[in-house]
From Swiss-Prot:
Coiled coil feature spans: none
Subcellular location: Cell membrane
CDD domains named in the record: F1-ATPase_gamma
Entry membrane topology: Peripheral membrane protein
Taxonomic superkingdom: Bacteria
Protein family per UniProt: Belongs to the ATPase gamma chain family.
Name the UniProt record assigns to this protein: ATP synthase gamma chain
NCBIfam families given in the database record: ATPsyn_F1gamma, PRK05621.2-1
SUPFAM superfamilies registered for this protein in UniProt: ATP synthase (F1-ATPase), gamma subunit
Organism field: Levilactobacillus brevis (strain ATCC 367 / BCRC 12310 / CIP 105137 / JCM 1170 / LMG 11437 / NCIMB 947 / NCTC 947)
Gene Ontology cellular component terms for the protein in this record: plasma membrane; proton-transporting ATP synthase complex
Single GO term (MF): proton-transporting ATP synthase activity, rotational mechanism
Main location: membrane
Length: 299
């Protein structure tokens, strides 16, 4: 049965209201994306310096003699995966993408569910793994849209404490890396234990420093220097991953809201065409009835 003019008009009004919402959300997401991109650029200056120091340390004898708990290379009995997702929906394929790729990464490395646990940053990931019976040993919800460095300290403190207490023996950070405003790429980076090879490889990704063999004179002592540098390195990895993931999240949300707005425009145009045709048909019917009535009177 064909829709009445009033039904079509009601759908047009409803779609226009939805379009106003998606358009407003698109503008909000764009503003958040612009803000976090500026913060990410500023953070890169800091993290590049930290990783440069780390790279030089990895080429010296300091790490070889370190007794830092973060470098504990014990046999791996349990692996932890720090999975970064959003707390809410309406972010396009962002969450489904990172969870799909994380599951593939976990299945490849630790196919036995008893051999791993999940540390979830973001409610979507926490709920996803809980509903599937996965051991979610830690969850952190409510990360700011533009996260500050202090937010990460709580996460890093909890994670490193769990590592030191041998709750798990190695940790990977899994998230979506922001490539540009229309695409992101899955990343899984080893965070703990902090070993010489991992530090050197990670630092080399972000610095242009030439390889060198460095000897350091440290004050007040080698151990005290490393007790400061290694936690800063761990914090930089987690904060950088969260900042990167949030940037990808806002980009995905911006694209999703733009797509929803465009779809609403297309639907409104289609409904308007149906409305015009229905109205024209109603007018034609009314004219026909008037003409028929006039002819009946004349006869």
């Amino acid at each position: 049965m064909a829709e009445s003019i009033h039904d079509v008009q009601r759908r047009i009004n409803s779609t226009k209201a939805t379009r106003q919402i998606t358009s407003a959300m698109h503008m909000v997401s764009t503003a958040k994306l612009n803000k976090i991109q500026k913060q990410a650029v500023g953070y890169q200056d800091y993290v590049s310096k930290v990783k440069a120091v780390v790279m030089h340390l990895s080429q010296s004898h300091l790490l070889d003699n370190s007794s830092s708990s973060l470098q504990s290379n014990r046999p791996v009995k349990k692996t932890a995966y720090l999975v970064i997702t959003s707390d809410r929906g309406m972010v396009g394929s962002y969450n489904s993408s990172v969870l799909r790729d994380t599951n593939a990464f976990i299945k490849e490395r630790t196919p036995n569910p008893d051999d791993y646990m999940v540390l979830a940053v973001g409610g979507t990931g926490a709920d996803f793994y809980k509903h599937r019976g996965v051991n979610v040993a830690y969850e952190y919800r409510g990360v700011s849209d533009v996260p500050e460095f202090n937010e990460v300290r709580e996460i890093v403190k909890t994670v490193t404490t769990m590592f030191n207490n041998e709750v798990f023996d190695e940790l990977f950070v899994c998230y979506n890396h922001f490539v540009n405003r229309i695409s992101s790429r899955f990343r899984a980076e080893k965070m703990l234990p902090v070993d010489k090879e991992t530090m050197s490889t990670d630092a080399a990704k972000d610095t242009q420093a030439a390889p060198l063999t460095a000897e350091y004179d440290t004050e007040p002592s080698e151990e005290e220097v490393l007790q400061v540098v290694l936690p800063q390195y761990a914090e930089s990895l987690v904060y950088g991953a969260i900042l990167d993931a949030k940037t990808a999240e806002h980009a995905s949300s911006t694209n999703a809201m733009q797509s929803a707005t465009d779809n609403a425009d297309d639907l409104i145009a289609t409904l308007q065409l149906h409305y015009n045709r229905a109205r024209q048909a109603a007018i034609t019917t009314e004219i026909t009835e008037i003409t028929g009535g006039q002819e009946a009177l004349n006869n």
